[in-house]
């Protein structure tokens, strides 16, 4: 009983829901053997002829290539492409390719030299001695992809499911109408196909190998049975003709009774599927050492006079193949790449043949019928009954038309195999597959954008984390670099803090003004005197500018001013040295009397200078103003020295001096002295060059200010013991009044001058 059940299960096939039975139209092209097509003059080889990214170019314009020479390098899902013939690379540029969008893709354009020379081919007839990895790598580098229409890299497919495959299925169903490429290949090359199947079985080591073929291919079935009569482990399963039984999920269910899970792959249930054309290409790559450079293409339709199946080089323009088949182009020719249900209309006839091109259908106008107007959906559910994937096409149609991407995804739009069965049975002539393709493209674009946004966010977050780590590292370095101050540094800091506290304590103490003391306003007085001197100097300069100087033999005024300043400085130094000699023991002298006597002495000295000056006036010799200034300075120095010598010693018992009267008398004396100097100066004016009045005035003002400061210091008694009984406010008021009166006397003296 168990053997009977096993034998029954061995030949059993299952069925799938849905499906249709359209007219097959295969007899137009499957009756003639495969033939070669003449080599075109120019071939266009797109760099991307598979699912995945295009490879890296390894040729450039002007290079000479041989047939089978790699044009790109490929890793992972980047599948290399090879030169289909020998010739010269004339261009590497975008070109329209075989895609429903009609977009241009980067392509290598080769001008054939007609020699069709191969590269050196190295076949592995002893492939059983090769490792699985070496065989998979050879298949990948020789550019083998799925030739059934998907174009998935075969090497990647074998590498991904090599450890868990229990059943290897060879798809020989070829269910779509008009297409007979696999049928004719099995009739003419059955032995090579079986060799390719054995290579796959050697790589995958499955428990069983199944070949699924529809019962509408009797010649191919007989040829395969003849080759498989002595083969072990390979079973041929003939299945009923039903569209789309050639779909991967549908054929898997038919042969094994298992369904591929939603969102999964056939390898999840231990099944791997390859096309018969792919098996043939694997045999040529491994045993013959020939990369994939050509494939079988069906040329059919009522618009061609010689339909059939041909060996077409990859990159051959569609126009060249159709012309070889006797294509009769109409005013608006329509050529479909693929079958009438899953194919697409080509944007032009210069599109090249690629690895997934299995059929070129050129129907006549009567064969395709008149285009029908699209009408509204009547919800008849005919599309749902015909769907082999158990979907709801009418709901997907509404979601796709309304841009409801989330709902379309929730209704498993990704499981649609785009077989066209729903559109075939639709009574409203709605092109459902077109809506589904567009919706898939939009969802894919949205997901790519979301992925890019997620990657950008991840990069931003990684950057922020890196910046935070760097900031923390810098802070840690700064923390480690910071050291405690040394003992001497701490001592210096403590000393500075103590000085600050002392200053604050001193600043907080009240200020006590001593009775009878005058504030030291010498700097302010000097500044005022300097401003007045500058004004007088500007006035004198303006007056001197209007007078012409008849002689150039006069003395240099700058030199005279310098010498006078030096003399005054020496006199002040002598005064400072002589002042404190006998101060502690000298008898007290009335400072007013001393000031008056000093003023009288200065006046007499100036008068003597004035008397000497007129005596020499008649003489032609000019008076030296520098000498006169020096003598005057010496006289003033002697007067100050006399004043300092008679400075009060016993200030605590002396009567306080009236500062106002002393200041007035001193101002009057200075005014008279300046007047005497001005009267004596112009004796030789006609012959002497004028001294720089601004410098002289400034120096004179500074000298007077310093003399006044010395007088104030000498006149101020030491009243430290009596300061407690005097009123400081009265003393400050008296000092201010004295300053005002002195300023007034000075202004009057200037006006008199």
Swiss-Prot record:
Family annotation (Pfam families): Complex1_51K (PF01512), Fer4_7 (PF12838), RnfC_N (PF13375), SLBB (PF10531)
Any single GO BP term: electron transport chain
Cofactor requirements of the protein: [4Fe-4S] cluster
Record region (Disordered): 517-561, 606-625, 640-659, 705-735
Compositional bias ranges of the Basic and acidic residues kind: 526-537
Entry membrane topology: Peripheral membrane protein
GO molecular function, one term: 4 iron, 4 sulfur cluster binding
Amino acids binding [4Fe-4S] cluster 1: 377, 380, 383, 426
Record's subcellular location: Cell inner membrane
Keyword DNA repair: no
EC number: 7.-.-.-
Cofactor note: Binds 2 [4Fe-4S] clusters per subunit.
InterPro entries in alphabetical order: 4Fe4S_Fe-S-bd, 4Fe4S_Fe_S_CS, Ion_transpt_RnfC/RsxC, Nuo51_FMN-bd, Nuo51_FMN-bd_sf, RnfC_N, Soluble_ligand-bd
Residues that hold [4Fe-4S] cluster 2 according to the record: 387, 416, 419, 422
Chief location: membrane
Keyword field: 4Fe-4S, Cell inner membrane, Cell membrane, Electron transport, Iron, Iron-sulfur, Membrane, Metal-binding, Repeat, Translocase, Transport
A GO cellular-component term linked to this record: plasma membrane
NCBIfam families: PRK05035.1, rnfC
HAMAP family to which the protein is assigned, alphabetical: RsxC_RnfC
Protein name per Swiss-Prot or TrEMBL: Ion-translocating oxidoreductase complex subunit C
The species this protein was found in: Klebsiella pneumoniae (strain 342)
């Amino acid at each position: 009983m168990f053997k009977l059940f096993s034998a029954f299960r061995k030949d059993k096939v299952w069925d799938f829901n849905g499906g249709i039975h359209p007219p097959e139209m295969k007899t137009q092209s499957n009756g003639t053997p495969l033939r070669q097509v003449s080599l075109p003059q120019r071939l266009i080889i797109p760099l991307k002829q598979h699912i995945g990214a295009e490879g890296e170019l390894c040729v450039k314009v002007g290079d000479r290539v041989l047939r089978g020479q790699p044009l790109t390098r490929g890793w992972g899902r980047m599948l290399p492409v090879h030169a289909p013939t020998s010739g010269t690379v004339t261009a590497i540029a975008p070109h329209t390719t075989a895609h429903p969008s009609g977009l241009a893709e980067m392509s290598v354009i080769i001008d054939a030299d007609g020699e069709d020379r191969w590269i050196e081919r190295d076949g592995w007839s002893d492939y059983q001695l090769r490792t699985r990895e070496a065989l998979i790598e050879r298949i990948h580098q020789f550019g083998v992809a799925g030739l059934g229409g998907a174009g998935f890299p075969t090497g990647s497919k074998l590498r991904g499911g090599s450890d868990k495959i229990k059943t290897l299925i060879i798809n020989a169903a070829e269910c779509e109408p008009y297409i007979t490429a696999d049928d004719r290949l099995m009739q003419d090359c059955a032995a090579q196909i079986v060799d390719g199947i054995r290579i796959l079985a050697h790589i995958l080591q499955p428990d069983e190998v199944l070949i699924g073929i529809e019962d509408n291919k009797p010649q191919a079935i007989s040829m395969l049975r003849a080759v498989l009569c002595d083969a072990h482990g390979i079973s041929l399963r003939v299945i009923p003709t039903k569209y789309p039984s050639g779909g991967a999920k549908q054929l898997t269910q038919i042969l094994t009774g298992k369904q591929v899970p939603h969102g999964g792959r056939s390898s999840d249930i231990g099944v791997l599927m390859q096309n018969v054309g792919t098996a043939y290409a694997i045999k040529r790559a491994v045993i013959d050492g020939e990369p994939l450079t050509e494939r079988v293409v069906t040329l059919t339709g009522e618009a061609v006079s010689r339909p059939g199946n041909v060996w077409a080089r990859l990159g051959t323009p569609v126009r060249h193949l159709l012309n070889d088949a006797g294509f009769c182009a109409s005013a608006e020719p329509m050529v479909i790449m693929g079958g009438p249900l899953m194919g697409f209309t080509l944007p032009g006839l210069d599109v090249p043949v690629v690895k997934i091109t299995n059929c070129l259908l050129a129907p006549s106008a009567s064969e395709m019928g008149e285009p029908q107007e699209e009408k509204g959906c009547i919800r008849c559910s005919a599309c749902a009954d015909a769907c082999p994937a158990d979907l709801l096409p009418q709901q997907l149609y509404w979601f796709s038309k309304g841009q409801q991407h989330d709902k379309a995804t929730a209704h498993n739009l990704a499981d649609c195999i785009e077989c066209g069965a729903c559109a075939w049975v639709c009574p409203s002539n709605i092109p459902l597959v077109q809506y589904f393709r567009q919706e898939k493209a939009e969802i894919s674009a949205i997901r790519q954008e979301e992925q890019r946004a997620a990657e950008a966010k991840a990069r931003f977050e990684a950057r922020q984390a890196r910046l935070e780590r760097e900031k923390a590292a810098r802070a840690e370095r700064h923390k480690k670099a910071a050291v405690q101050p040394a003992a001497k540094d701490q001592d210096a800091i403590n000393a500075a803090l103590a000085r600050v506290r002392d200053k604050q304590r001193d600043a907080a103490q009240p200020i006590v003004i001593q009775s009878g003391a005058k504030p030291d306003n010498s700097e302010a007085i000097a500044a005022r005197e300097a401003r007045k001197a500058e004004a007088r100097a500007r006035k004198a300069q303006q007056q001197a500018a209007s007078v012409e100087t008849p002689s150039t033999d006069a003395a240099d005024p700058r030199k005279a001013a310098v010498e006078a300043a030096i003399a005054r400085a020496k006199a002040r130094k002598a005064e400072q040295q002589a002042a404190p000699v006998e101060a502690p023991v000298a008898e007290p002298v009335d400072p007013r009397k001393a000031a008056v006597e000093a003023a009288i002495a200065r006046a007499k000295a100036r008068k003597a200078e004035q008397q000497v000056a007129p005596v020499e006036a008649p003489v032609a010799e000019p008076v030296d103003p520098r000498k006169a200034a020096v003598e005057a300075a010496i006289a003033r120095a002697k007067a100050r020295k006399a004043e300092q010598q008679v400075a009060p010693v016993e200030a605590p018992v002396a009567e306080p001096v009236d500062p106002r009267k002393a200041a007035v008398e001193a101002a009057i004396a200075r005014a008279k002295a300046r007047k005497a100097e001005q009267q004596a100066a112009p004796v030789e004016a006609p012959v002497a060059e004028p001294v720089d009045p601004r410098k002289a005035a400034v120096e004179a003002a500074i000298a007077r200010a310093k003399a006044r400061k010395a007088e104030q210091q000498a006149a101020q008694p030491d009243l430290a013991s009596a300061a407690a009984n005097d009123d400081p406010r009265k003393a400050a008021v008296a000092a201010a009044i004295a300053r005002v009166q002195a300023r007034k006397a000075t202004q009057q003296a200037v006006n008199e001058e």
